[in-house]
Amino acid sequence: MKKLLVIVYPDMNDVEYTNTMVVFGFVKELQTVIYHPNLSTVKGSNGVTLVNQITSKVNLEEFDGVFIPGGMGATKVLDHDQQLLDTIRYFKDHDKYVFAICDTPNVL
């Protein structure tokens, strides 16, 4: 089974997060773990999505890749969060999958 870390952050795009998570849910060989190091609840930019099953401690070596939804929060929040950027950098530096949508690649 493959394991994917899903980084969430305030003002991420609701549609990009929810639609992608629905697709991931159809993949029986994929386990997703929702992650933010400091927040227990994250609200999407449109106020439609409220994520509250967030893990704050993970062993990055256990994951095959990372997914980061986009949206306005990418440049407002993610771009200034060194801990999250270091987490994403780990996947790049270890030749693991990095999936990013919309504005997130601009931050990376």
Swiss-Prot record:
* Entry-linked PANTHER family: PARKINSON DISEASE PROTEIN 7 HOMOLOG, PROTEIN/NUCLEIC ACID DEGLYCASE DJ-1-RELATED
Entry-linked Gene3D superfamilies? 3.40.50.880
Q: Which domain of life is it from?
A: Bacteria
Report the protein name in the record: Uncharacterized protein MG029 homolog
Gene Ontology cellular component annotations, sorted alphabetically: cytoplasm
Among Pfam families, the record links this protein to: DJ-1_PfpI
Q: Provide the species name.
A: Mycoplasma pneumoniae (strain ATCC 29342 / M129 / Subtype 1) (Mycoplasmoides pneumoniae)
